[in-house]
UniProtKB/Swiss-Prot annotation:
Name this polypeptide is given: High-potential iron-sulfur protein
Job of this protein: Specific class of high-redox-potential 4Fe-4S ferredoxins. Functions in anaerobic electron transport in most purple and in some other photosynthetic bacteria and in at least one genus (Paracoccus) of halophilic, denitrifying bacteria.
Gene name of the encoded protein: hip
GO molecular function: 4 iron, 4 sulfur cluster binding; electron transfer activity; metal ion binding
Recorded superkingdom: Bacteria
Species: Thiococcus pfennigii (Thiocapsa pfennigii)
Length: 81
């Protein structure tokens, strides 16, 4: 099943969590959380991501949608092994 991509402009959850699709090209929260600085925080290394690979992956914070592996939001939490 192909899920739609979350739209930061229209999705209220994405808006409240300041989701950005490309964290490399956007300004984001520079605060260091855990051991990673803001510049190293992405959806692909977040504990909420639900797949190990893919450019767009399901996220527990955005039910029914996928997020960009290079995205970021305020709820980012470091994914541990």
């Amino acid at each position: 099943e192909d899920l739609p991509h979350v739209d930061a402009a229209t999705n209220p959850i994405a808006q409240s969590l300041h989701y950005i699709e490309d964290a490399n090209a956007s300004e984001r929260n520079p605060v260091t959380k855990t051991e990673l600085p803001g510049s190293e925080q992405f959806c692909h290394n977040c504990s909420f991501i639900q797949a190990d690979s893919g450019a767009w992956r399901p996220c527990t914070l955005y039910p029914g949608y996928t997020v960009s592996e290079d995205g970021w939001c305020l709820s980012w939490a470091h994914k541990t092994a």
